Every structure is written in structure tokens, then in C-alpha cells.
Amino acid sequence: MDIKRTVLWVIFFMSAVMLYDNWQRSHGRPSMFFPSATQTAPAAAGGASGTGATTTTAGEVPAAAAGTAPSTTAPAAQAQLVKFSTDVYDGEIDTRGGTLAKLTLKKQGDGKQPDLYITLFDHTAGHTYLARTGLLGGDFPNHNDVYTQVNAGPTSLTGDQNALKLSFESPVKGGVKVVKTYTFTRGSYVIGVDTKIDNVGTAPVTPTVYMELVRDNTAVETPMFSHTFLGPAVYTDAKHFQKIDFSDLDKNKANFEKAADNGWVAMVQHYFASAWIPQQGAKRDIYAEKIDPALYRVGVKQPVAAIAPGQSADVQARLFAGPEEERMLEGIAPGLELVKDYGWVTIIAKPLFWLLEKIHGFVGNWGWAIVLLTVLIKAVFFPLSAASYKSMARMKEITPRMQALRERFKSDPQKMNSALMELYKTEKVNPFGGCLPVVIQIPVFISLYWVLLASVEMRGAPWILWIHDLSQRDPFFILPVLMAVSMFVQTSLNPTPPDPVQAKMMKFMPIAFSVMFFFFPAGLVLYYVVNNVLSIAQQYYITRKLGGVKKKPA
């Protein structure tokens, strides 16, 4: 097989994987490894679903500073922060707009590991991330108005209590009063958000409810040297999962589905996401835009059928705010598991994570699950590795003869190439025979890299001794040092490149990679260390026991 054919095989294989993956995602195929989510029944109460998508534009949604009211000469009331606590959340609701202004996720430790916390929603001088709602279509209550807590009582989920409800009432504006109720359920990262619209005026009203996520472009908990997606995302049955880059919003060039009666909108970051999930069947417009030099929003606008005087309408929605755990996400809403983004290797990464999860269920430790999965993958690919290492061993055996031929014919490149080709033919050696078996394995190992990088299950997960968190770098750099040593050993087992420059590069590569791996999450470095050690063992066994060839004089 010559180099052209090898390159063609590589291009064909990678293209096939990418095309099939895109086809899978564009058609919203359910996971082969997890249960499919069930659709939520369409809205039926109070005409909340509306009759058609509103024609208003995203610019009509109030865009005053996130969570802050525009200046007025005589503010009607002073906003307050209402603190609450559940088994999975600590948070604050700002009475200005009844906005979910702070939300800290809690992960209980097991006694050996401490509790883990991450603040998802926040509104400080250095970071803004909010979930808010309001009404459009008139001078109706929105996120700039100060609400009043209704029936103020306990704000903590205690004892045998299964749910915590917090309600907030708006001032009357345009003949409309809004009562917003948050329902927090024990053990759940899904928050029920009910918007009750009362027409207390003398004329019918046709408001539109907006639900949006607002945040800046500040990345949090992103590993050094590793890029993960940060920004809005939209899911609809028509276009399926669409990521929106902040840079596209900067240029007003974002391309996404603008109207639907299904799906959700989200803000995605490393390990965690939030998503507004309106009722299925309720028509809505979808918008995403930049509203400040470093502030963005994504949301939906859901029209409400006409409400007669003295009548009311309920608009129910769900707000997910939590970790990107695949099994949980699959059960919440169709396509929500896609916020855990594996990129173009999704088709391979999802089964790998499924297998990793099964192994973890057996051994009870994510570190050992990584080790065992790596061993299993190496065992599956052993025949391909054997073919590659045999070819490399043969090349190593004839390297002295190749160098002698290059020295003999260095002044005549044509004769040198002819002599080398004759040597390959005589010894039945393909100089590129070790490439294709390795290339075929590359997508699998890249996929496993993304599985370990994207899986929130690694966060706070210990392995042994000094490794207390597989999502953080090795505190004593022991694994990166082992990684560097294994790379040096592996390099020494390979044939020495005839080109002195290439030879120096091969010696320098372990150093360069080791510098990066010093800052990689420990789980990723563990995978590479185990993979390298197994590769060294395989290569040693094959070259010494199976691929031995007697040296022949030049």
C-alpha cells in the first residue's frame, strides 16, 4: 500500500464517520444506550398555548441591565433577595422580576470526599448568569418590575417535605397581574415555573410570555489547554441541536431555528447547563442576541390566547439547571443530552461512555473504570496493533541496511529510491504497513478523550491515594511524569527516523506533550498513561516474540 492509498483510506474513514454522525444528529435519532425521553403533553389550560407564533422581534424583550431596573424618578418598591435551600440547590430569587439570580449546585460527599459546590446562576460585578421571565404585548409586568413574595413561609426543603413552592406577585400593569411560582422538587434539577396571568382590567388582553437565559461570556471550570463549548444552544424537532457561538451573535450572523412548537433553549458550559423547556405543542418564537458588550441572551416568546376581564391563564414551563449527566438528561426532554457535546465523534463517544458507566457500576470507582475500559479497548484492537508493530519491527530490523543504502547512493536519489524499493520487495516489508492499523484506532481514542473531558461524573471522583478529583490536575504531577517516561520508552522502541531532524523531533515530542499534560485533568492523563504502558507491553511482546527477524548484512 503506497502513501497515496493510505491517505485516501484515512480521508474516507474520517469522512464516513463525520457524515454518519451528522446524519444521526440532524435526524434526532434516540440513543441506543439510554432510554428515550417522553414528550410533555401540550398545554391545555387557559389558552396558554396560543394559536400562532408571535410576530414580535427579540428586540421587544426588555433589555435593561440584567436583573437591574432602569432608572426612575420614584421607584415603587425596593427589590430584595429571597434565599432558599433544597437538597441540591442553594439560591436566591430577586424580587425585581422574580428573577432566579443565584443558584448554587450541591453534590453531597460520601464521607471520604467533601461536598462539592458550583454557582451556576449569579449576579456579581464579575459574573452575570440569570434566568428570568416576563410579559410582552403591552405595558405588562416584566423582569424590571418589583414583585412581592406571596404567603412568605419556609424557604428551605426540610424533613419529609418533597417539594418547595415559592410564589411572587407582580404589581398591576396594563390591567394585568402576574403570579410567578417556582417549584423545587427533592433530588431534581428540574424547576417548575408557573406563570399565572390575571386580567384584572376591563378589556381583553393578549400578552406574550418570554422566558430567557442571560449570561456573559466568562468561562468557568475549563481545563487548561482544553476547549469546550460555551454559549447558547437551541433544539427543535425540525433542526435538532444547534449551537450558537458568541462570536456569531457579536456579528449578528447566528443561524438557528426561529420558531417552533417544541424543543428548548439552553446555555451550555463545561460540565453544566441550563435550559428553558416550554410545554410541547405551545407555539413560540426563539431568539438569541447580544444585549451588552459582554452580555448575551437566548429565550423563547410564547403567545397567550386572549384573556377576558376577570379571567386568567397559566403558562407552565420547566427550567433545568444542573450537571450534564447523560442518563438524567435523556429522561428530561428530547435531545437535552446533546448539551453534553462530544462534537463530531458523538457516534463513537456515546457507546464508549455507556460502556464506561457499566464498568463503573461494577467496580464503583471511575478511576479504575478508566483503567479497565482502556485495557478492554487495547484488547479489542490487539490484532490491528500486532499488524502495526510487526511492520514496525521489520522496519527496525532493516534500518541499518536502509541507512547503508542511503549512504551509498546519497549522490543519486533515483538509484537510492530504486535500491530501497528493491530492499522492501526482497524483505516483503511495506514502509507504510504500520500506518493504517493505527489510523483506524485514532477516532476511538479521540472519542475516549472527549468522553473523559466532557463527563461531569469525573468531577470530584477520586481514584487512589493522592488523586482525589479526576477532573482536576494531578496535585503532585506524578501521572504527568509517568506519562513522559512512558512516551520516552515508547519512542525508543520505534525505528529511528533516517532524517536527523525527524529524529530530534521524536525525542522532543515527549517533552512537549508532557508540559501540556501537567495541566490536564488527572482522568485524562490516567487514560494516556495506561494506554502507553499497554502499548509498550504489546510492542515489546510482538517485536520480541512474534516479529523477530534475523538481521541480514547489507
Swiss-Prot record:
Superkingdom of source: Bacteria
Matching Pfam families: 60KD_IMP, YidC_periplas
GO molecular function, one term: membrane insertase activity
UniProt membrane topology term: Multi-pass membrane protein
Sorted UniProt keywords: Cell inner membrane, Cell membrane, Chaperone, Membrane, Protein transport, Transmembrane, Transmembrane helix, Transport
Cystine pairs: none
Subcellular location: Cell inner membrane
TM region(s), chain numbering: 7-24, 362-382, 436-456, 475-495, 510-530
CDD domains per UniProt: 5TM_YidC_Alb3 (cd20070), EcYidC-like_peri (cd19961)
A cellular component annotation (GO) from this entry: plasma membrane
GO BP of this protein: protein insertion into membrane; protein transport
Similarity annotation: Belongs to the OXA1/ALB3/YidC family. Type 1 subfamily.
Record's function text: Required for the insertion and/or proper folding and/or complex formation of integral membrane proteins into the membrane. Involved in integration of membrane proteins that insert both dependently and independently of the Sec translocase complex, as well as at least some lipoproteins. Aids folding of multispanning membrane proteins.
Known partners and oligomeric status: Interacts with the Sec translocase complex via SecD. Specifically interacts with transmembrane segments of nascent integral membrane proteins during membrane integration.
NCBIfam families referenced in this protein's UniProt entry, alphabetically: PRK01318.1-3, PRK01318.1-4, yidC_nterm, yidC_oxa1_cterm
Protein name: Membrane protein insertase YidC
